[in-house]
Amino acid sequence: TSILDGWTYEQMMDFASEQGFECVEVACWPEEKAERRYAGVSHIDAERVNQDDEYAAHIMAYAEKAGVEISALAYYPNVMTADKEKRNAAIEHLKNVIRASKKLGVGMVTTFIGRDQTKNVRENLELVKEIWPPIIKLAEVCDVKIAIENCPMLFGEEQWPGGQNLMTTPPIWREVFKILDSDNLGINYDPSHFIWQMIDYIRPLYEFKDKIFHVHYKDIKIYRDKLESCGIMAYPLEYMSPKIPGLGDVDWGKYVSALTDIGYDGCTCIEIED
C-alpha cells in the first residue's frame, strides 16, 4: 500500500474495497523521513498495535467491514546495512512488525534480508548467521511467516555497489535456507526482478514451491536498444523500467500457470512502481 502515501488506513481500505481488491499488503514503516521512494509509508502503526488493544481491534474490525484481507504487514528496510545505528533501529522495528502481525492475526511479514554493501556475498552470508537467527526465532514463537522479496534493491547509483538486498537469486536462496533452516522463512516472489537479471522466472517456482509464501504481480520492460548500448554493467534503470502487469516482458500466462501447477493458493498483490 506504499503507493497510497498520505492516505489513512481507513481511506486505503475503503479504496481497496471499492476497487474490488480482496487483499492488501499493508505498509508498516516507522515514523521517519523516507530515504528512498516508497519507504516511510505507514498505514498501520505496528508499535501502537502492540501497545493499544483498542487500536488493534479497530484495525481488524475495519478490515472485516471492508471485506479486504490483510495479506501481510510490509516493512522493507536494510537490516544488514553497515550503519550499525540504522541496522539496530531497523531490526527492532521489524520485530515490532512481527509481533503486530501476530496480534492482528495476519501471520505474515514481507521484507528484505538486507545487505552490507561494503561486503561481498560470502561475507554477507556470514552476516546473515549473525543477524537473522533471533528474528527467525521470534517469528517462530509468534507463528508468523517471513517472506523475503527477491528484489536486488539496485536501480541507480544510490544503491551501488551490490544493491541492498542479498536474497535475489536461487543460488543465494539455497545458501540462506541452509543457514536459516526454518519453516517460517520463505519468499515473496516477484518475477519482474528476474527479468532484468536475466534469470529464468518460471523454474524457481517449482524448485521452491514450499517456500513461496506471498506473491507480487509487477512487470519489467527491458529496452533492448539501451541495453545493447550500455550493457549489463550499467545501472539497471538505464535499460529497464518497472511496469504494471501486462506492460512489460513477463509472460503472465506462463507465470500464473506455474503458480497453479505448484498449488499456490496464497495472496497475490499488485506492486505499482511505474
Question: Residue spans of the language-model regions?
Answer:
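N-terminal small/glycine-rich loop or linker at the start of catalytic domains
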Residues: E35, I70-T81, R115, G231-E238
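Glycine-rich, proline-tolerant flexible connector loops at the mouths of alpha/beta enzymes
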Residues: E25-I59, K119
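Active-site acidic/histidine proton-transfer and metal-coordination neighborhood
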Residues: S17, A56-E69, N78-G186, W196, ...
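A short, structure-level motif marking secondary-structure boundaries and short turns
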Residues: H43-D45, T81-D83, K119-V121, Y239-P242
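Residue-level recognition of beta-strand->loop/alpha-helix junctions
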Residues: A27-C28, A74, N150
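Histidine-acidic metal/acid-base catalytic patches
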Residues: T1-C23, C28-E32, A57-H58, E64, ...
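A generic secondary-structure micro-motif detector
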Residues: S2, R48-V49, R87, L125, ...
